[in-house]
């Protein structure tokens, strides 16, 4: 979609699928599995050594502490820099698209409550959807898988 629209992707996935698909403006709320951090500075990422990608107890980060994956584990806080960027992108959106999410994982589900009044909300999911509690935004549900649903939405948006 970036070839025709300004797009910011906010993802809870730790993989690099969006980048491999050509997306350039991706906010990884839960970190990136293909990067490392340290136990001392878990929000400062650096590239994994491609020749030695495994992490072992005793492997040291540049700051001397244990290496860890650059991901957010259950009950860990999201990096505030990434959360603020997500909130800002949401508040500036003309169109907000949710693809294949239960909308139950917080704090990401809170973003739906921050969508501007004039912003259109589209939800692409083959199943029935329920907005998070407290979110009363009207939405258009494209009951489809991600690829087909995004193609359908792209065609719709091009007509506007």
What is each model feature region?
Residues 1-160:
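Conserved catalytic alpha/beta core of Sir2/sirtuin-type deacylases, generalized to analogous enzyme cores
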